[in-house]
């Protein structure tokens, strides 16, 4: 039992929790992601420059059964051009020929008309290649070692992709809880790098022929499209999304389109039962709403990142903070340990908030605080248990030999017990108790010498007060 209440037990507990953090099971990762969600939700709400054109229930009522004939999409492009739209982006894909024979008209409206189409990287994709834009790699790393790899593509009709100004992927990064928080800016299929849809939109807007990226041995650092600042990414080219945007939305065939003043328009399906809803920390998003948030995140230069060093830094800070808490309790006192605990928690929280507000770097607050609390609670419990057992031991050893007042003094302050005794000025009182012999003999006959000691202590206490 003595070992279980020693400092080594608390240290072993810290090592156990550090081991769990290194293994990083799914429930720990989920807790961390939920914490990051709260950080991102703290960002101020902003109005996006991207306009959404939805194909919803009213659109179906006006244009009939979905999928629409391609000449309907040609008319949609015409209406957007009359509304002075800028870049027109489709999150709808057109992999098959139109059963109504409207492909030729649609292609003519897509051709050289500021249209960007979508692709989907998938293991079930029937294509293993598509038109792509070259990528220049800077640095000593190989991007192909880090970006997500897929076996196939869901593409559009080749004539459409040739006519469009750009084509981008609409994939997101798979999370442990299936909530979309990140998208990879680059993916590889059949040995080629393909851009995400937001990246392709920016390239076309800037009239650039290619991208450039920087990669080191530990992953991709950033993706660049001048004149924008480098887009900071995670090691696999993923970026965190700011979903705190509000977008102007119109339903095609129902809402009158205003003068769009050259704004980028993303077209997508929202009709119930046809459109898939994407779970995000802010709720369910449509495909075009998610892509609009991703595009606006990049345009605004919102830097949300979790560099690879953050995990190691968190483990180191957990170790240092927990050891400070445990040591202060065992070697000083519980009250000093409580002060150290609050100081460590406050300092770590300030550090996390500083990195987030100044650089957009995500440091996990939740797991560290949990370990600090458990370290403090276990050490404080051990300390109280040790003190409790010591008081019990003092009472058991001295209650039959010393007066209750003196025993209570020793219980409150065990340091009063000094080996070898101590020097004090003392006053002695000699007395003779009348009838003491028969009293002591009575206790002897009752086999209760302790009772006699208790009686004498009571008598002497009363006489000396």
Where are these regions (language model features)?
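Non-transmembrane functional regions of envelope-associated proteins
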Residues: 2-229, 260-334
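Short gly/ser/thr-rich secondary-structure transition/capping motifs
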Residues: 34-36, 248-253, 408-413
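Substrate-access "cap/lid" subdomains that shape
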Residues: 213-256
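Feature representing long, continuous alpha-helical segments
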Residues: 293, 297, 322, 392, ...
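Juxtamembrane or sensor-core-proximal signal-transducing alpha helices
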Residues: 373-404
